[in-house]
Amino acid sequence: QYKPAIVRGNASEIIALAGLWGLEGEAADLSRVRGVDTTDTVDAARDAAVALARYTGGAVVVSGEVDLITDGTTVAKSHGGSPLMSKITGCGCSQGGVLAVYACAADPFTAAVCGTAVYNVAGTRAAAVADAPASFKVAFIDELYRATAQDIADNQLELEEA
């Protein structure tokens, strides 16, 4: 009866979830999850993400080197972040909290795009001043705090039809 406004996961998680909900047929069997890590690519999860977004009527975020965000009609790709983000336990999970904050103030797709952009901006800036996981984590939190609406607007974003 109640469907999520925003779903966020790595490529393998999104493919598996679409499979569990019967949206992608064999996709869940093809997904390669290793704990919370993924061996699937963001591009491989595109169809599953679009199907999930159409099913929920919300937005889906697939995190990766270039994040994919879709509402089932439009696909956005958000650039930025840092490879160090994958070295921080819970970094992907905490993105869910950031997305939830934005979801309180905007429609699901806009919230997902803005929340992902601010995450990528913070990751890029933190990587410029930190070169190891512990210092990166502190710098990342500081950069989330410092991010502005203009930073979100300046984040590199590609848009295409789903």
What residue spans do the PLM features occupy?
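Short pre-catalytic strand/loop immediately N-terminal to key active-site residues, enriched for Gly-Thr
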Residues: S78-T89
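A generic structural signal for secondary-structure junctions
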Residues: G19-G22, T116, Y145
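Charged C-terminal helix
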Residues: V121-A162
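Conserved phosphate/ATP/ADP-binding segment of small-molecule kinases
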Residues: Q1-V75
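Electropositive phosphate-/nucleotide-binding environments in soluble metabolic enzymes
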Residues: R8-A11, V42-R46, C93, F109, ...
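Short, small-residue alpha-helix embedded
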Residues: A16, K87-A117
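Short, well-structured alpha-helical segments that form the helix of a local strand-helix-strand
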Residues: A48-A53, P108-G123, F140-I141
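Glycine-rich phosphate/pyrophosphate-binding loop at beta-loop-alpha junctions
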Residues: T70, T74-G80, G115-D131, F136
